[in-house]
Amino acid sequence: MSRPIRVALVAGEASGDILGSGLMQAIKARHPDAEFIGVGGARMEAEGLKSYFPMERLAVMGLVEVLGRLFELLGRRRQLARDLIAAKPDVFIGIDAPDFNLGLELKLRRAGIKTVHYVSPSVWAWRQKRVLKIREACDLMLTLFPFEAQFYDAHQVPVRFVGHPLADAIPQQADRAAAREALDLPQDGPVVALMPGSRGGEVARLGDLFLDAAIRLRALRPGVRFLLPCATPERRAQLEQMLASRDLPLTLLDGRSHEALAACDAVLIASGTATLEALLYKRPMVVAYRVAPLTYRILKRLVKSPYISLPNLLAERLLVPELIQEAATAEALAQAVAPLIDGGQVQTEGFDVIHRALRRDASVSAADAVLKLAGRD
């Protein structure tokens, strides 16, 4: 009788903890006695992960913070590699966190352990030479999006497109009436969601712009109301300060971004992962982004993709307007959003096709691929 399958996983942040816990559930459905070791958060630990150290020790953002913790991170990776090689798992899964996980995967693969990387870095957009390291470090790449799988196929990296868990979780048809009731909004009349980002720097660059665009939009559509979900108390305080000098029928929400998307008719949104959520809720959108001029010049040279927003990358065409840098003025944003409030059918039809393509029971698909690689399917 064979021993229980032993699976090692490392997640470095909350989104990875969610993906990891779903994957563990799907593996346990096939192998109830599976053993899980590695690094994860509360969700993965609840599924039975024995975590070598708190996941928060890996959750660093920004160059300065990474440099300040570099010796600790490298030391933890060396020790983790030793511990995992000694534990001899059937397979290792690095969940996102590529700067930490790819180096770990390389060491483990050289020691004879099968390695999987779950969630592709943005190699298709920039720093494409990273694919050489990925090819050396990974036995298998699991991607959330089909265009990523096409990129890896072209570079001879074994890959499986598993779909996106959000596409499984968000219904094909969101209930606008129920969402408006939950948010104490009237059932009639246009509602626009403003989503200028979740980080302080994004809100500093886009918050005033989005609020000025809302004022212009109000002149074009006098009855329109606005919702603005705040990711954290800090973002709420930042936005309250911006709102103090403006007279707008706007409701600030603590979190509740999914309810805001379900309740609204259209969205003005910063480029980022929230655009995928807006797409899955089938809400017509205008995407805007501004970065520091020097950053933009550098990115313009490095980025190989023709689009910046996920909806357009997934559609492989200009499905949603993208207003970037100087083009993102309050007037231009208002003019772009206004016709979408009751006329965004071309966008929503495209979103529906994409949602169906991404809905593949991602955790089960990922578990199938992992177990097949480990020879325990």
Swiss-Prot record:
**Catalyses which reaction(s):** a lipid X + a UDP-2-N,3-O-bis[(3R)-3-hydroxyacyl]-alpha-D-glucosamine = a lipid A disaccharide + UDP + H(+)
One of the record's GO molecular function terms:
phospholipid binding
Q: In which pathway does it act?
A: Bacterial outer membrane biogenesis; LPS lipid A biosynthesis
> What is the uppermost EC class here?
transferase
Keyword annotations for this protein, in alphabetical order, are: Glycosyltransferase, Lipid A biosynthesis, Lipid biosynthesis, Lipid metabolism, Transferase
GO CC, sorted alphabetically, is: membrane
Going by the entry's taxonomy, the superkingdom of the source organism is recorded as Bacteria
Kindly indicate whether the keyword Glycosyltransferase belongs to this entry: yes
What EC identifiers does the entry list? Answer: 2.4.1.182
Show the InterPro entries listed in the entry: Glyco_trans_19
| GO annotation terms (biological process) | lipid A biosynthetic process
User: Pfam family of this protein, just one?
Assistant: LpxB
On whether NADP is a keyword of this UniProt record, the answer is no
Family of this protein: Belongs to the LpxB family.
What exactly does this protein do? Condensation of UDP-2,3-diacylglucosamine and 2,3-diacylglucosamine-1-phosphate to form lipid A disaccharide, a precursor of lipid A, a phosphorylated glycolipid that anchors the lipopolysaccharide to the outer membrane of the cell.
Protein's recorded name: Lipid-A-disaccharide synthase
- Please give the organism: Ectopseudomonas mendocina (strain ymp)
